[in-house]
């Protein structure tokens, strides 16, 4: 009986510990105007540190990192909605006002989601290579109901050997940046990620459709895109995806891939600084 009580106690402690895991981790730096830096899928908040160093004027950075990535304990699914919920709670608790949101990829999705809910607290938004509805571009015509956690592709990814997953990570990293040293870094982030978060979290992203929220966002928005495969394909996609935004500027980088901060850093800094100075 005593042994049973001890085991039960350990189970409760373990369960409570998992339940209390935070969906986000935030590192602060600097002072003055709050800038919430939202990285993309698998990326840590530190991916934005060089951008922060190159911002003109005084800013207080909030570098966000996500559960399940970069050594942060995973949380139960659904994942994306938990990130958004905790970010909104963080902003309210910290009483942040006149916030600049800067988000890459999935971070751009979170920026849209946050601005739609807390519009009176947001001053400007910078979205870097993010789509409001990925599945429309990647898998047009596929209904949202088709995206479930339990599906053959997800199960294959969850059960993949380390070698097979590393090969997949290598190919994906090569498609995200032209910088070979950064490809190695991206591959490392993917391999070190909690596998279930990596697989199921991406399913969460495929379910997203933020287009209905765009009309509620009144603040200026800068949308920066990578010219891959080419500008003639990319620009119409961005224009269509963000047609609901009333106050937007869209610019496409001269070259590079998804991680614009790696492939075109000076162009990125110039675009953001010009936008924030208006």
Please state what every model-predicted region is:
Residues 1-24, 220:
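Bacterial Sec-dependent N-terminal signal peptides
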Residues 28-73:
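Conserved HGGG/HGGXW glycine-rich cap/lid loop of the alpha/beta-hydrolase fold
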Residues 60-102, 106:
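Active-site loop/oxyanion-hole signature of alpha/beta-hydrolase fold enzymes
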Residues 97-139:
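Conserved hydrolase catalytic core segment
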Residues 125-160:
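Flexible "cap/lid" loop of the alpha/beta hydrolase fold
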Residues 136, 141-142, 158-215:
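Conserved alpha/beta-hydrolase catalytic His-Asp/Glu region
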Residues 221-257:
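Conserved loop-alpha-helix segment in the C-terminal half of the alpha/beta-hydrolase fold
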Residues 256-265, 269:
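Catalytic histidine-centered segment of alpha/beta-hydrolase-like enzymes
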């Amino acid at each position: 009986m005593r042994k049973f009580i001890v085991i039960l106690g350990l189970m409760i402690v373990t369960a409570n510990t998992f339940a209390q895991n935070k969906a986000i981790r935030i590192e602060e730096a600097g002072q003055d105007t709050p800038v919430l830096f939202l990285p993309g899928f698998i990326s840590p908040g530190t991916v934005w540190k060089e951008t922060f160093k190159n911002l003109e004027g005084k800013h207080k950075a909030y570098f966000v990192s996500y559960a399940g990535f970069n050594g942060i304990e995973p949380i139960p699914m659904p994942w994306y909605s938990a990130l958004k919920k905790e970010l909104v709670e963080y902003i309210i608790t910290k009483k942040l006002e006149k916030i600049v949101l800067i988000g890459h990829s999935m971070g751009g999705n979170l920026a849209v989601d946050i601005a739609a809910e807390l519009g009176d607290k947001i001053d400007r938004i910078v979205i870097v290579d993010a789509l409001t509805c990925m599945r429309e571009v990647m898998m047009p015509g596929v209904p949202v109901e088709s995206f479930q956690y339990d599906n053959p592709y997800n199960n294959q990814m969850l059960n993949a050997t380390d070698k097979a997953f590393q090969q997949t990570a290598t190919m994906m990293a090569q498609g995200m940046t032209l910088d070979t040293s950064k490809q190695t870094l991206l591959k490392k982030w993917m391999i070190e990620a909690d596998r279930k978060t990596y697989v199921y979290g991406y399913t969460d992203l495929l379910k997203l459709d933020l287009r209905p929220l765009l009309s509620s966002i009144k603040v200026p928005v800068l949308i920066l895109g990578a010219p891959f495969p080419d500008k003639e394909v990319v620009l119409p996609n961005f224009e269509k995806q963000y047609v609901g935004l009333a106050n937007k500027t869209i610019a496409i980088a001269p070259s590079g891939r998804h991680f614009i901060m790696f492939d075109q850093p000076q162009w990125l800094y110039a675009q953001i600084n010009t936008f924030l100075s208006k």
